[in-house]
């Protein structure tokens, strides 16, 4: 898997900077996680490995500005599924600050809070290549890029352009979505191998997405 950087530094320099400082390098993968699935986990794990991050935090949104609330199940279920998905998984953890804060989850507000709470951490905010095109429309984007380093996940050989500093990480295409899984379950089909078995067992036990 290839790593391409469209920023002023390289992976080697990033590793050297880590050795020379005590600052932690933490990735953030935000999402509705309704439910979490294997593509989420592959992205989080591969970004952590390719960039040599200390950890990647999966951050469930409370009320994302772009998601219909009617399609989002209770946060307690989403959080339980996240916990089951990363149980015993090295390098992945959960950040719940947006659930605790409640209200609409704007990335700028969240990252301002996290950087103030953890001044010894450098944050890498992970987004899909499709979201890179929308960065100019993000809430307070010019201030946000001063708080975090964006990491764009893309298919090999796919090129997305942006004037904002983005580290590009190439990953194989996994055409899995939460809406696909919900649709499978609603139609009585088992979404085997699309999400962790423990998560699927929880969905079945709780009767979710029927």
From Swiss-Prot:
InterPro entries: Cyt_trans-like (IPR004821), NadD/NMNAT (IPR005248), Rossmann-like_a/b/a_fold (IPR014729). One of its GO terms (molecular function) is nicotinate-nucleotide adenylyltransferase activity. It catalyses: nicotinate beta-D-ribonucleotide + ATP + H(+) = deamido-NAD(+) + diphosphate. Keywords: ATP-binding, NAD, Nucleotide-binding, Nucleotidyltransferase, Pyridine nucleotide biosynthesis, Transferase. Its EC number is 2.7.7.18. It is an enzyme of class 2 (transferase). Pathway: Cofactor biosynthesis; NAD(+) biosynthesis; deamido-NAD(+) from nicotinate D-ribonucleotide: step 1/1. GO terms for biological process: NAD biosynthetic process. Gene3D superfamilies: HUPs. Signal peptide: none annotated. Belongs to the NadD family. Catalyzes the reversible adenylation of nicotinate mononucleotide (NaMN) to nicotinic acid adenine dinucleotide (NaAD). This is Probable nicotinate-nucleotide adenylyltransferase.
């Amino acid at each position: 898997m290839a790593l391409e950087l469209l920023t002023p530094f390289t992976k080697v320099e990033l590793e050297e900077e880590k050795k020379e400082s005590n600052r932690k390098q933490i990735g953030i993968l935000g999402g509705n996680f309704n439910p979490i699935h294997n593509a989420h986990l592959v992205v989080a794990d591969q970004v952590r490995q390719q960039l040599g991050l200390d950890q990647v935090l999966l951050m469930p949104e409370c009320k994302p500005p772009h998601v219909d609330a009617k399609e989002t199940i209770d946060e307690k279920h989403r959080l339980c599924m996240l916990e089951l998905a990363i149980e015993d998984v090295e390098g992945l953890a959960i950040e719940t600050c947006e659930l605790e804060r409640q209200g609409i989850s704007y990335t700028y507000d969240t990252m301002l809070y996290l950087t103030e709470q953890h001044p010894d951490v450098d944050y890498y905010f992970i987004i899909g290549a499709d979201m890179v095109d929308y960065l100019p429309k993000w809430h307070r984007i010019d201030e946000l890029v001063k708080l975090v380093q964006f990491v764009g996940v893309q298919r090999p050989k796919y090129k997305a352009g942006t004037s904002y500093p983005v580290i590009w990480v190439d990953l194989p295409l996994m055409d899995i979505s939460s809406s696909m899984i919900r649709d499978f379950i609603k139609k009585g089909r088992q979404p085997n191998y699309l999400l962790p078995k423990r998560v699927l067992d929880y969905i079945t036990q709780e009767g979710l997405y029927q």
